[in-house]
């Protein structure tokens, strides 16, 4: 797609935007993301996706629009680049701005809401100019033909370099180190699962289908004293999140994790946690910790990492697991599109194996995401064939899940999914509902649920009005699990 403005025209637009306020999504006031979207809309007539600013490089398909570059110490940002700050900014949501000037040591940007007051009227914080030191947790985005790159910016905290130039000393580049895993062996006490009689033949890697709060420690708290009736619903050998590994079963024990006798008896099951609730960066870190633990165990058992020793849950039974890993590393969503095809299954296994082998060799692998994956959301987007349309023009489909509200009240409607329908009540922050239906109507995505005999309709994000499968959805106003 050709940008609507030339580079010089876009720079002029940035200059004229100074002192103005932008609230493109009409939500949470004048955020930095709104200012990025204002520029993107001027350039392409499109809006960027992502729950927070930090998600922009991963939540959007930049084919034909922008190119991703890895920054190097001698890389110089250009006017018009979009800079994206990581999760260590903006209370975990990151920050985004437009570059108008740069050296190897600092960038000068146009930005909005750097000080965090944009969620209110924020009139004292309109779009303005700021100066930032280069930081390793930044990314920058460049448009094709406009030189607006997505690049990683190195970290520079030496203020002296801003004023005094001097020859660079050649220094040895520090080698990355693997995180130190915190392995907690606390075997479940509600039932003594039988022994295998030998070491495992390999490892089955799972995605837990857990929420943001479903950490390894949370599983430990919920399962370590659970009765047999709960364990029969499923228990893996280890649960991994962050740098924590909770070992729930001894290596010698059979697990109940594949719904298959061979998988349960001969393979060690590891759950990558938070697969329905974590953002992509968090989930990818959980994966890396899992690969590191797999490498440790395989070396302990004297096994190589190959297609026989590294297995997927969907090899043993018809399941979408590992669903999140499938989307991220193959671009195929087994939740909405059906069982993972064999070529995608092998693609995912080979990715796992390559990562694990690197750890076994004492190296630190780099996590990669398929260019076929939007890598933008952990919410399920249904396929077009699942939607139906009623006489009122409402697109609807069956879907059962739990929605947990974010930090703002939402007006619930009765009768139907229209903003003109009677008000039911105010759905409070932190509240949740178990819904059975999803609808597209009146500029919003709605979920339908029944409470105390009354049917309610709750909007949970915006919708651009396009029919499935071409709908464009706004940020989710909470979490789905």
UniProtKB/Swiss-Prot annotation:
Gene Ontology molecular-function annotations: metal ion binding; N-acetylmuramoyl-L-alanine amidase activity; peptidase activity
Q: Tell me which residues bind Ca(2+).
A: 34
Record-linked SUPFAM superfamilies: Cysteine proteinases (SSF54001), N-acetylmuramoyl-L-alanine amidase-like (SSF55846)
The note on the cofactor says: Zn(2+) is required for amidase activity.
Q: Which Gene3D superfamilies match?
A: endopeptidase domain like (from Nostoc punctiforme) (3.90.1720.10), Peptidoglycan recognition protein-like (3.40.80.10), SH3 Domains (2.30.30.40)
Question: Domain Peptidase C51: where?
Answer: 7-142
Task: Cite the N-acetylmuramoyl-L-alanine amidase domain residue spans from the record.
Answer: 197-323
User: One Pfam family of this protein, by short name?
Assistant: Amidase_2
Q: Tell me where in this chain the SH3b domain is found.
A: 398-466
Enzymatic class: hydrolase
UniProt-listed Enzyme Commission number(s)? 3.4.22.-, 3.5.1.28
Keywords assigned by UniProt, alphabetized: Antimicrobial, Bacteriolytic enzyme, Calcium, Cytolysis, Host cell lysis by virus, Hydrolase, Metal-binding, Multifunctional enzyme, Protease, Viral release from host cell, Zinc
**Activity vs pH:** Optimum pH is 6.4.
Required co-factor(s) are: Zn(2+)
Reaction(s) this enzyme catalyzes, per UniProt: Hydrolyzes the link between N-acetylmuramoyl residues and L-amino acid residues in certain cell-wall glycopeptides
Q: Which InterPro entries match?
A: Amidase/PGRP_sf, Amidase_domain, CHAP_dom, Papain-like_cys_pep_sf, SH3-like_bac-type
Q: Which residues form a coiled coil?
A: none
What domain notes does the record hold? Answer: Contains a cysteine-histidine dependent amido-hydrolase/peptidase domain (peptidase C51/CHAP domain) at the N-terminus, a central amidase domain and a SH3b cell wall-binding domain at the C-terminus. The CHAP domain is present at the N-terminus and is associated with the endopeptidase activity. The SH3b domain increases the CHAP domain activity.
What is stated as this protein's family in its record? Belongs to the N-acetylmuramoyl-L-alanine amidase 2 family.
- Role summary: Endolysin that degrades host peptidoglycans and participates in the sequential events which lead to the programmed host cell lysis releasing the mature viral particles. Exhibits lytic activity against Staphylococcus aureus. The CHAP activity cleaves the peptidic bond between the D-alanine of the tetra-peptide stem and the first glycine of the penta-glycine cross-bridge. The N-acetyl-muramidase activity cleaves between N-acetylmuramic acid and N-acetylglucosamine bonds.
What name is this protein filed under? Endolysin LytA
Q: Which organism is it from?
A: Staphylococcus phage phi11 (Bacteriophage phi-11)
